[in-house]
Regions:
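Low-complexity, compositionally biased segments
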Residues: 24, 31-34, 46, 71, ...
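Acidic-residue sensor for enzyme active/binding pockets
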Residues: 21, 50, 78
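Charged, often low-complexity linker/regulatory segments
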Residues: 1-47
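Short, basic/polar, glycine-containing "phosphate-handling" surface segments that engage DNA
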Residues: 1-12, 59-63, 73-74, 79-94, ...
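Short linear sequence elements within intrinsically disordered, low-complexity coil regions
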Residues: 11, 33-34, 41, 52-54, ...
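Active-site metal-binding core of divalent-cation-utilizing nuclease and nuclease-like domains
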Residues: 39-72
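N-terminal, well-ordered alpha-helical segments
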Residues: 26, 30-34, 51, 67, ...
Length: 154
């Protein structure tokens, strides 16, 4: 898939844009993998959709949850439907970080915007924002491809 095709498919007003959060998340992520020429999730122990976890709350209660996409040593990724709060998605990922082996990048997306939040031990977090319409730019593609291939470059 080419970046232009991806933008057309996921732009506001398209049938794909109208997909619900869960159906849209996996389809969008697979398309991103194809645009960037990286493998799709397929190993429940290192790179998968719906990575299960159990988090412990401040009162000691335990809650089960799932990260939409997880790649060991690279990222945890949480999707929201277009227009929904990416801040809420980030809060969710921050709570999930420890049970997910503290990935160095926390990524949130509403399929129109991808926000990459660095989560490196001992350093302040940085936020990098990429918009759907910018996906054809080579420098944006290079930065996003680095999520899979060189997370330390963030």
């Amino acid at each position: 898939m080419q970046a232009d095709d991806f933008i057309r498919k996921w732009s506001a007003g398209s049938p794909a844009h109208a997909l619900g959060e869960r159906a849209g998340a996996q389809a969008d992520f697979i398309d991103l993998c194809r645009v960037f020429g990286v493998p799709e999730p397929g190993d429940p122990d290192s790179y998968c959709f719906e990575r299960g976890l159990t988090k412990t709350g401040s009162t000691g209660g335990r809650t089960d949850g799932f990260a939409d996409v997880w790649k060991r040593g690279c990222f945890a990724w949480e999707y929201k439907a277009p227009g929904r709060s990416l801040e809420a998605a980030l809060k969710q990922l921050v709570m999930y970080a420890l049970p997910l082996e503290s990935p160095p990048l926390l990524v949130v997306s509403d399929r129109q915007t991808v926000e990459v939040h660095t989560h490196f031990t001992g350093t302040p977090s940085e936020r990098h924002v990429f918009r759907l319409e910018d996906m054809t730019r080579p420098e944006v593609q290079q930065r996003l491809r680095a999520l899979w291939l060189a997370p330390e470059s963030y």
